[in-house]
């Protein structure tokens, strides 16, 4: 135990008490038996333990609420994550507070401060600044300050953030996708959607290039088209692509929403999917199933992702050991939007 930073949870485990009991001793709360107090103080002295804000705050009464920040709940990716998290939270007697930031930094800062003022027991963030390659410095500082007072879990890599992280591993799902496309006879791939300052998008592009390289194939820069992560973005990008009179063989959409925009543009231009162009996507949300044709899509395993984030929070609050960084694998769901050539 001496090889790592000692936490209030380590003290609680060794003393055989709850983290809240340790916090009461640290704050000189009278509601602790003398026998427990002496035992805890001896362990604190043994490790020369210096409590931080999180250790002290555990002695306060729980609000049984968890705040969750997402960019836009209208995106089925984020709504699915929220619903799955809420289902787990309810099993442990917690309520969820949903905050939509609309991908706006000032809104993220405001929501984060408001959640702290409401004394929520933990905070989850998915998307937004947590996905940026260069997140806002002020926001990172605020996240780190918050993480010293309460459990903070982000559903991504979030550079610079000193909190718990659960991110999606892109390589496995992309490998399945490329193997499938190659088996269908496709070799020239276009990637549509996103921007190169967003970590999940960068990881997808890296994974795609790596997987193609294994088959001695390349992804030329002109085959990567940036656009917004929504239906309008996919529609505009596909219009641009079709107007270039260079009909693609297969398109990988960065998410299902972009794929829906691509479908809309193709329908207007009398381009048939998959007869003329194969189309595959990422996320495997309800959009994949209601699309015509139904979309082959890489599943982000959102249920597992959500459960890991919630279990991390419950473990921290309960004083159980948990990994600082966890990952979730992706897998391919094959439907009707890809043809054999």
Task: Map each language-model feature to its residues.
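Alpha-helical recognition/docking segments in bacterial nutrient-uptake
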Residues: 1-3, 7, 61-179, 183
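N-terminal helix-turn-helix DNA-binding module of bacterial transcription factors
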Residues: 1-63, 339
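Short acidic/polar active-site loop segments enriched in Thr and Asp
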Residues: 18, 64, 121, 186-188, ...
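Conserved hydrophobic residues forming the short capping helix/wall of the S-adenosyl-L-methionine
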Residues: 44, 89, 211-212, 242, ...
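Hinge/beta->alpha junction and helix N-cap segments in small-molecule ligand-binding domains
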Residues: 71-80, 99-107, 129-133, 165-176, ...
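Flexible loop/turn connectors
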Residues: 239-341
């Amino acid at each position: 135990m001496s090889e790592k930073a000692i936490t209030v949870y380590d003290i609680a485990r060794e003393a055989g008490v709850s983290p809240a009991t340790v916090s009461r001793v640290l704050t000189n709360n009278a509601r602790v038996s003398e026998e427990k107090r002496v035992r805890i103080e001896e362990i604190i002295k043994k490790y020369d333990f210096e409590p931080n804000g999180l250790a002290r705050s555990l002695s306060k009464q729980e609000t049984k609420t968890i705040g969750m920040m997402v960019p836009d709940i209208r995106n089925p990716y984020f709504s699915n994550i929220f619903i799955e998290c809420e289902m787990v939270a309810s099993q442990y007697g917690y309520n969820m507070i949903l905050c939509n930031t609309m991908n706006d930094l000032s809104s993220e800062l405001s929501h984060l401060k408001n959640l702290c003022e409401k004394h929520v027991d933990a905070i989850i963030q998915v998307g937004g600044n947590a996905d940026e390659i260069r997140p806002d410095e002020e926001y990172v500082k605020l996240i780190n300050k918050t993480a010293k007072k309460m459990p903070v879990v982000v559903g991504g890599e979030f550079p610079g953030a000193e909190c718990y992280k659960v991110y999606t591993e892109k390589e496995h799902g992309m490998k399945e996708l490329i193997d499938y496309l190659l088996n269908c006879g496709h070799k020239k791939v276009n990637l549509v959607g996103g921007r190169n300052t967003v970590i999940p998008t960068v990881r997808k592009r890296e994974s795609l290039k790596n997987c193609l390289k294994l088959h001695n194939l390349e992804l030329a820069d002109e085959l990567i088209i940036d656009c917004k992560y929504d239906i309008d973005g996919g529609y505009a990008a596909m219009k641009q692509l079709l107007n270039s009179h260079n009909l693609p063989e297969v398109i990988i959409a960065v998410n299902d929403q972009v794929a829906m925009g691509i479908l809309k543009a193709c329908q207007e231009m009398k381009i048939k999917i998959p007869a003329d162009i194969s189309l595959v996507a990422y996320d495997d949300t309800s959009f994949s199933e209601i699309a015509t044709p139904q979309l082959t899509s890489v599943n982000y395993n959102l249920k597992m992702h959500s459960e890991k984030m919630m279990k991390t929070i419950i473990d921290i609050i309960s004083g159980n050991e948990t990994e600082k960084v966890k990952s979730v694998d992706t897998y391919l769901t094959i439907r009707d939007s890809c043809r054999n050539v």
